[in-house]
Amino acid sequence: MKPKTKKKLIRVLTLYLPMTFFLLFIGIPLLWALSLSFREGSSVIKGEFQFLPDPITIANYVYVWTRNRLNRYFVNSMITSFGSVFVIGFLALFNGYAMSRFAFKGKRIFMVILLMTQMIPLIFNMSSIFLMMVKLKLANSLFGICLLHIASGLPYNSLMMKSFIGGIPREIDEAAAIDGCNRAQIIFKVILPAVRPGFTTVIAYAFITCWNEYLLSYTLLTDAKKFPVSVGLKYLVGEYSTDYSALAAGCIIALIPPILLFAYVQKHLVSGMNAGAVKG
């Protein structure tokens, strides 16, 4: 075997083959759920194997969207996710700029504490969080869920923004200041365009985290009209029986916003993650 052919074979076996297995491991369940969502519930109960549904029906989507309040759950998730992401994005930008550009006493300790907050599992603090939200009368409210999303997501995203902004030379700030820009203008007109891939990464990561959040919403929300999609899907599982076709349709609907977001920002997302890895 030629050395060049041998190298190519080794590369395929060590890189592409594991990636193919990983994609199949992730992709087959998604394709199976998509197939289930277009099948009649009776065929699933009977255990009939049909990868391609016959006949194809959208009744499951209509059922979960209208009769199981998924439309309401979807709106609630949009409200909490976009509301939280808007605040997280700009506060992370300001925090990242401050940590990158300013030298203040206790800066290193402050950053270590920020990082340590991400090492504590959320469930460890659930009892204290629940009592605090009840005392503040913010339990069972979407506003309270937004505040908790912001509090839990801000530390890590601030450190990410610090990493991205740290890769921009300080001379750019000084040149903008000489041209008459104040601090806010430097951040929004100079820094933000320069770190757009990184800022997009922060926004995408924060949105997906908020959209997929389950524990806080399940613990604090008692009014079914305020449930997000992640909690609402649980109630598609019956006590004695489950319509798996309807459940699959609900899961596919819940996947649409993150998939659309990733498809839209994937170019910036990949470059931003690479930049963060290099600049960190």
Residue ranges of predicted features:
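A structural signal for multi-pass alpha-helical bundles of membrane permease subunits
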Residues: 2-280
